[in-house]
């Protein structure tokens, strides 16, 4: 028999015997340490339940939406958003959404943007170097 095969088989046999001896012992899920942790976990669970009930009571105290105004009316009303909420960025957002952007860029199409950024072909590219 080859010495390398004999060594590997011997190691496998020793590993198997070691694991089989460990398997003969019982390993309960709950040990003596888990019994001492139980009151602490129970107290934590009680505090969590109290906190959840407080939050639910607080949500019920929050003033509900007015009965005459629906969700769509609230969303569309100008009073729903503060006056300075959109601010100066609103016009920029509208410009980006509009179809004029493609006409102002001078590009043949969106797919040429990568070519245009490298060589300037197909777009009126302003170099800022």
UniProtKB/Swiss-Prot annotation:
Residues 1-26 form the signal peptide. GO terms for cellular component: cytoplasm; extracellular space. The keyword Signal applies. The keyword Transmembrane does not apply. The record marks 99-101 as: Cleavage. One of its GO terms (molecular function) is hormone activity. It is found in: Secreted. InterPro entries: Natr_peptide, Natr_peptide_CS, Natriuretic_peptide, Natriuretic_peptide_brain. It comes from the Eukaryota. Keywords: Disulfide bond, Hormone, Secreted, Signal, Vasoactive. GO terms for biological process: blood vessel diameter maintenance; cGMP biosynthetic process; cGMP-mediated signaling; negative regulation of systemic arterial blood pressure; neuropeptide signaling pathway; receptor guanylyl cyclase signaling pathway. SMART domains: NAT_PEP. The precursor molecule is proteolytically cleaved, possibly by FURIN or CORIN, to produce the active peptide. May undergo further proteolytic cleavage by various proteases such as DPP4, MME and possibly FAP, to give rise to a variety of shorter peptides. May be cleaved at Pro-99 by the prolyl endopeptidase FAP (seprase) activity (in vitro). May be degraded by IDE. During IDE degradation, the resulting products initially increase the activation of NPR1 and can also stimulate NPR2 to produce cGMP before the fragments are completely degraded and inactivated by IDE (in vitro). Cardiac hormone that plays a key role in mediating cardio-renal homeostasis. May also function as a paracrine antifibrotic factor in the heart. Acts by specifically binding and stimulating NPR1 to produce cGMP, which in turn activates effector proteins that drive various biological responses. Involved in regulating the extracellular fluid volume and maintaining the fluid-electrolyte balance through natriuresis, diuresis, vasorelaxation, and inhibition of renin and aldosterone secretion. Binds the clearance receptor NPR3. Belongs to the natriuretic peptide family. This is Natriuretic peptides B. It comes from Ovis aries.
